[in-house]
């Protein structure tokens, strides 16, 4: 049971496949009198072929001038510590199994804003052919004019990359406060990116399994 919680990792885009994997592992490690081991932290739903590496995205955003606070990236360490505790729990009784679940949920909540950043970056690869760019000025070449005017996403991306915007917090919330065309364009872009990420089940190994990476 301890090897199961520490060393077995898996991901599949089909939720039923993930549940069947859990069932097979539970049957293989069944112990009379003990609850089923908590496995949600290591067996997850997602598309393993479509995800991003956190350091790559972090570097790409910094090149474009985005504000990235180190405190936001400290979330990775906190989540890893919580998940390390989950792996150390034996789930020998209901109380330990519940604690495993609570710690895993706390880790997921910590990682959610970073997950949103990776989802956004991956979605831009789909929405803007040629993304990423190494200079914001190159974006205009990737986005065609609309009715003779610059594409509204140019304003939206510029607004998100503004050094006065905490990008991780904004993407985590999914909404940029304020009014105006640039803010509206940014919110429309984030909405489309989030919908695409949900629909395609993007899976980022770096944030899904922080104890490994």
Give names to the regions the model predicted.
Residues 1-213:
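SAM-dependent methyltransferase catalytic region
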